[in-house]
Amino acid sequence: MVLASFLVSGLVLGILAQQMRPVQSRGVDLGLCDETRFECKCGDPGYVFNVPMKQCTYFYRWRPYCKPCDDLEAKDICPKYKRCQECKAGLDSCVTCPPNKYGTWCSGECQCKNGGICDQRTGACTCRDRYEGAHCEILKGCPLLPSDSQVQEVRNPPDNPQTIDYSCSPGFKLKGVARISCLPNGQWSSFPPKCIRECAKVSSPEHGKVNAPSGNMIEGATLRFSCDSPYYLIGQETLTCQGNGQWSGQIPQCKKLVFCPDLDPVNHAEHQVKIGVEQKYGQFPQGTEVTYTCSGNYFLMGFNTLKCNPDGSWSGSQPSCVKVADREVDCDSKAVDFLDDVGEPVRIHCPAGCSLTAGTVWGTAIYHELSSVCRAAIHAGKLPNSGGAVHVVNNGPYSDFLGSDLNGIKSEELKSLARSFRFDYVSSSTAGRSGCPDGWFEVEENCVYVTSKQRAWERAQGVCTNMAARLAVLDKDLIPSSLTETLRGKGLTTTWIGLHRLDAEKPFVWELMDRSNVVLNDNLTFWASGEPGNETNCVYLDIRDQLQPVWKTKSCFQPSSFACMMDLSDRNKAKCDDPGPLENGHATLHGQSIDGFYAGSSIRYSCEVLHYLSGTETVTCTTNGTWSAPKPRCIKVITCQNPPVPSYGSVEIKPPSRTNSISRVGSPFLRLPRLPLPLARAAKPPPKPRSSQPSTVDLASKVKLPEGHYRVGSRAIYTCESRYYELLGSQGRRCDSNGNWSGRPASCIPVCGRSDSPRSPFIWNGNSTEIGQWPWQAGISRWLADHNMWFLQCGGSLLNEKWIVTAAHCVTYSATAEIIDPSQFKIYLGKYYRDDSRDDDYVQVREALEIHVNPNYDPGNLNFDIALIQLKTPVTLTTRVQPICLPTDITTREHLKEGTLAVVTGWGLNENNTYSEMIQQAVLPVVAASTCEEGYKEADLPLTVTENMFCAGYKKGRYDACSGDSGGPLVFADDSRTERRWVLEGIVSWGSPSGCGKANQYGGFTKVNVFLSWIRQFI
């Protein structure tokens, strides 16, 4: 840059320099600098031209220099000229702009339409004819409107009409205005009209009327129908004329109103009534809906909603509300587990085949609470053996339960007072075998019952079982929408529904909500507590999410609503008839449906003890509805029960002989027929063909017998335990085909009156005996409290192991018939010495249990002087302890003849007036009663010998029974047998008041034969 040619004084420049120091970045126009020029491009691609730029003075280190003012450069000036179409040096704007551009520097975009011209400076549009608006976007006049094909129009003028006249083709009527005009705002005065067909006129229905608008019946016209009382409208209440000339529906009719009959009250139910027609002339006009809800713990059986049909009938039978047992029922279940309040029925469902199982039933029609409830229902005729539902009713306290044999079940009698029950039928509410019961709905191949009643899982399962179903089970990915819709319709969001495992071969994996996995190793239904991986939780279905139901678990004991399910496929299977009970047998059922025997189910039979099965063990229900084989029979095995074992004996049972025994007497084959030899051989029967089926004998022989039963042909061999007994009856008995033992019952009778001492003649004078010579001799000691000792005061005779016979006066208080307490006596058997200290081990001492004195005993004259003592413990028969024989009428006639000798024994007073230390014996002859009475009369001691007494002794006296011998035996020898036996004919009873062994004063004895009937009442 060149400075101007004139000079500036140093002073001026210095002042300017001082003033410029704070703003050294800006120049000053001092008029000292010339213009400069920038080369810029006009337009794109355009051309190059020069743009003049003014310069200002700048200072650097106090020296001035020139450059464009404001530090402008070419890059700051040239770009704006590129938008111009034509440029001019020195002009601070574009001369002209390219098309559709306007403004000083052509930066605006023209918005003119329809051929409008844009102003280069302002952008304003200059419009062509027929267009207006800021951008020439508006066509002057109104736009043309479309019309229907049946509409005819005349435009005026044709190109830019200001009016349009409309008309219709023949057969159509104009709907709307006939002329429209174009308004100043460019809008037509109305919409174009339409040409529409006219609908036919409609007359009032019979028993009703129609309300129609005035004028033509064209599209949009509405008819309103109504009926006279008591008729109601069948069809649409309003009809509208459509554009095609047709009404919107069929012309309705008026039909006379029909009423359904009144409904009976349903116990334990609430109901809501919704009237189905506008008129309310009666309680239940057609269309009425009645909805039932059971209260409390009652479940609805049947449809919950009934509708009154047009024919005056209800859509279904009335439902019932019943209590349903919440425990599963089997053939062993007792009624006590299901009874409710008195008179209250409870529904249970019995499985099939209960008449084939064991179980006690008490009563007829009314049953004891501990009875098998299903067997009782069959007995009462309320259920068949194929099972089914029944109502159990608490009948309250009852007694005198009667037994009977009904419907293949035998009930027992019971007299005790107890709670009782009876049965009511369950009314059928099914829609046939192939459909679902009333109130159930079909889900695929199942019938489902949904309830809002809440139960713990196990209780819910029990309710379902007693409704002939099971708790519902679904597959994880197959949740029917009909089920979820039903649940939502009942307001149930969480319901016990089990999750089914599909593959038994693979572990079942179930994804929980927390995304953890539970692996189960078997094909059980994953819902019950106690299953693998599921100790206390059960599965339920949660449908709170409207889009996606989810499976969850919670405590099995927590109540929840639930769904029951029954399989429809079973109901479509062939069904076999109930085979009925197996007499004397039992049955195990496999695969049967809950309400009968369907194809594929089977029954396995078995027999009770002592019976065998004749026929097929297992029968199966085939697809044609018949059993694969007839029902078998249980045939009784004939046996004999344990034969009675005689006291003091034994019996040995030997099995049937495997070889034929040969009779030694009367055998028919000991004589041969006189036939020719060939004929004799041919007379033998041909061998019987062998059967592949086991015979009844073979089957019976394979039955295991319980203890105490023996097969036909078994033999019972009897023996007595020792030689002191003899066997009476049959020694051997055989089990006959009638189940009885042959022969007579055996018994072991003590051998009586036998002495093991050497057989010797009578010894006439009294003397000591040998040890064991008189083994029936008993010593009776009485406790003397005053002397603190036992005293041997009487004798007695052993009749058998437990009974002693003695004199009545030995066991009663003196001069009375009052019996002394049995505890005051001890009885000795096998005793020889009076002194107890000299007794050996063969002496048996027993206590008295009971004492029986003849009721006619007279202590004044000692008539009926006889008594029996029962021992607490039986004695053991030995050489020194054996019973005496009782007399018979024959022996008494033979022995009680005058002069017949007998032996009396005892420890009584001897001739020295002391008690014998050893047992003594004396031989006495029988004396006639008259002689006895005469002798005492001569001694001035008159007495009477009754028919219950006899006398024995010597005229001269000396040998006699005496004090201490009372009650002892007077025995006679019986030599009528091979072996001598001794018979008890008398009991020492009384003697002379003057003493023992007095002349003509004989001893008195009780006549034993007179008292045999009385004795046999006890022994």
From Swiss-Prot:
- InterPro entries in the record: C-type_lectin-like (IPR001304), C-type_lectin-like/link_sf (IPR016186), CTDL_fold (IPR016187), EGF-like_dom (IPR000742), LCCL (IPR004043), LCCL_sf (IPR036609), LE_dom (IPR002049), Peptidase_S1_PA (IPR009003)
Tissue-level expression reads:
Expressed in hemocytes (at protein level).
Q: Where is the LCCL domain?
A: 325-421
Query: Which residue numbers delimit the C-type lectin domain?
Result: 436-568
The EC class name is: hydrolase
Q: Which residues form the Sushi domain?
A: 140-197, 198-256, 258-323, 574-636, 689-750
Activity regulation note: Activated by Gram-negative bacterial lipopolysaccharides. Inhibited by intracellular coagulation inhibitor 1/LICI-1 and to a lesser extent by intracellular coagulation inhibitors 2/LICI-2 and 3/LICI-3. Inhibited by the small molecule diisopropyl fluorophosphate (DFP).
On assembly, the entry states: Heterodimer of a light chain and a heavy chain linked by a disulfide bond. Forms a covalent heterodimer with intracellular coagulation inhibitor 1/LICI-1. Forms a covalent heterodimer with intracellular coagulation inhibitor 2/LICI-2.
Protein name from the UniProt record: Clotting factor C
Q: Name the source organism.
A: Tachypleus tridentatus (Japanese horseshoe crab)
> What taxonomic ancestry is recorded?
Eukaryota, Metazoa, Ecdysozoa, Arthropoda, Chelicerata
